[in-house]
Amino acid sequence: MKKITFILFLLTSFAYAQQQTVTFTVAPAVFSEDESITVTINGNSINESTWSVNDNSLYLWGWSFDSNDQNTQDCPTNGTWNSSDEANKFTYNSGTDTYTKTFVPTSFFNRTGIGSFGFLVKAKNGDGDKKSQDIIVQVGSFQVDLTTPADLSSTILSSGSDFSISATNTGGNASYVLKSNGTTIDTNASTANYSYTHTNITENQNYTLEVTQGENVITKTFSVIINPGTIIEAMPSGYEDGITYNLADNTKAILVLDAPNKDFVYVAGSFNNWQPTSAYAMKKDPDTGKFWLELNGLAEGESYSYQYWVVEETPVTNSPALVKTADPYSTLVLSQFDDPGIPASKYPDMPVFPSGQEREVTVLKTGGPGYDWQVTDFEKPKKEDLIIYEVLVRDFDAEMSYQNLIDRIDYFSNLGINAIQLMPVMEFEGNESWGYNTAFHMAADKFYGPSDKLKELIDLCHQNGIAVILDVALNHAFDRNPMVRMWMDDPNNDGWGGPSSENPYFNTVARHSYNVGNDFNHQQDRTQYYVKRVIKHWIQEYHIDGFRWDLTKGFTQNCTANDEACTNTYQQDRVDILKEYADYSWSLDPSHYVIFEHLGTDIEEQEWANYKVDEGKGIMLWGKMTDPYNQLTMGYTENANINRVGHVSRGFTEKRLVGYAESHDEERLMF
C-alpha cells in the first residue's frame, strides 16, 4: 500500500484595517535612561471594542534604539504578536479612564546606551492590525535633530551638485564633526545650530555627523547617491540574469540585472567596501535594456557579498526612489534578520552578514571545488511505483538539519519507500517555517545547513535507490523577494510592501482565490524566464528528480481574489503555462517527475495527466482522499467509497494519480 503525503498550503489572509491613533503622555518629559518613567494612554482615544477588547486588557509593544537611532532591539518581554506577555500589560485606571505603564528604560529594554525607544498599544492578539500608530520617544536631555537631510536617508543628486546639511541640538552648545567617506570635511567646536554645504559632489558619499556634548556623543548618518547617467554599452553574449562566472578567469564575474523602468543601478559590495564609485555603476544593454557589470580583481575561492542599489528618480506613488536588494537569482543569501539564529554547529564557517548594511545580500565566490557527485546516472523509480515519504526538515529531528536525514538513511531504506519529498528548502523568510513563504527560489535556506549538505543528502538517497522530489511554491513570493522590492508599494516608507502598479512580475491583487504572499503573473515573459531558471538550477545543480508544484490553481490570470468558483473551474491559461513549464523540465531531464497539487476538476486534471503520456511522460496529480478513508477508519459506510484513489475513476489514461489518505495539512488518521 502506498502512503504518500504532502502539504496543501491554501491560506487566505483576511487583514482588517483596525489601527487606531492614540493620544499619550510620557512623564517626566525629559529623562535619562536609568530614570523611572510613566507612559499614559488616554482611554477616550481608543475604541476597545474595535479590537474585541472588553476587559481593558491593552498591552505595550516596545523596541529601543541606540544613541545614534540605530541597532533596534525588541523589548524582551513583548511576547509574540498574537499573544503579548502579561509583563507588558497596561494598568487601567477607571477613575481617569487612562492606561499607564511605569518602567525604567534600561531595565525594561535590557540594554544601556538608549537614545530613543518606540512603542505602540495593542490588543493581546494583534492580528488584523489591532494596534495603534508607532510612537517614538527620545531618551536623555541631550538630543540632536538632523534637520536636513533626514537621518538615515539617501539623497539622489546629479554630478556636480551641492548638498546642504543642518542640525540642532538641546542642552547647550556642542561640538560637530562632519565626515564624508571616512574623511573629516567640516568641524564646529561650539554651536547648537549647525549648517554646512558640501559643494561640487561627483561621487557617492556616506556621511557621519558626530555631535559631542560633554561625555555624550550622538552620530547621525546619511548618504548621497550620484546619478551617473545612462551608460549604454552592449552586453557580451552568453550572459544570464544573476551571476555568470568567467570559467577561463577566476578573477572575473559578470552581474546582470533586469530592472525595467529603473534609471540607474550601482553594485555595492565587500569588493568596494560598500562605497561604490562611478566604476560600479552598471551599464545598460541597448538591445535587452538589462543592466550589467563585469567585476575584476576577485580572489579565487574568496566569498564576496554584494547587493544592487536600484534607483528610479521619479517612481510611481508610494514607491521608493532607492531600493537596496540582493540579486533575484542569488544561490546563497545572507540575512540580517535570520542569520543570527543559525548556529555554527549547523552551518560551519557561514559567511557573515556585512556590518552596517541593510537588507539581504548575495554571496559570490569564483573557482573552488564543486560537489563531487558519487551517482551521476541515477535511474528513477517508475511514476506508477512511487512510494513517497514527505519530510519537513525542521520537524524530522531535534537538530533540524540535512545531517539529521543523512544520519537516518537506513531508516528511510527500511521503510521501503523509494522517494523523499522535501517540503520547500528554498530560502524562506525566517528560520523555522514550512518553507512556503519563499523569498529566493534559487537559494537553499541556510537554517538546515550548507548547500553541499543538501547535495550530499540527495547523492546518498540516490545511492540507496531513493529519488528526491522538491516541493516548490512558484505561484507566489514573499516581501523580501527582490522582484517584489524593486517595484513595491510602500506607503509607510518602511522598506516593506507589496507589488506596485509597475511591477513586471507580480499582480497588485491576486488573480485567484487561494493566494498567500504576492501573486506571480505567469503570463509575463519575465516571470516565465524566472521560473524556468529556477527549474534549470535545481535539476542541474542539485540533481533533483522532480518537483511537486504547490497550489497550481494559482497560475491563472482569469479570476479574482474573491471568486472561488472561477478559481476552481477549468482555466485555459494555466493549463497552457503549466504544460510549458512541464515541457521545459522534460527538456532538461526526460524522466523528471512533474507533480501538481491542483485538487481541481477532472476535466482540467485530465489535460495534464494525459499530456504526452504516450511518450512515458504525463503530469501526476495529487488526489486527496482523506474524508472517505477517515470514514472507513471509523467503520462507517456512508461517504466511504475510495474508488477515486484510482486513476481510471478520474479519466486518466495511465497511472498518474498520487492518491493519499492523509497529509500533514490534514489530521492524521493513524499513529
Range-by-range predicted roles:
Residues 121-123, 211-213, 310:
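Conserved structural position at the C-terminal beta-strand
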Residues 113-119, 203-207, 302-306:
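Exposed beta-strand face motif in extracellular beta-rich ectodomains
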Residues 29-35, 152-161, 246-247:
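Short, solvent-exposed loop/linker segments at the N-terminal edge
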Residues 325-330, 368-543, 551-570, 580-589:
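Substrate-binding/active-site clefts of carbohydrate-active enzymes
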Residues 163, 233, 426-427, 434-437, ...:
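Active-site-proximal helices and loops of the catalytic beta/alpha 8
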Residues 57-110, 247-249, 254-303, 311-340:
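Aromatic-rich carbohydrate-binding modules that target alpha-glucans
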Residues 224-265, 317-385:
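Basic K/R-rich, polyanion-interacting modules in nucleoproteins and related proteins
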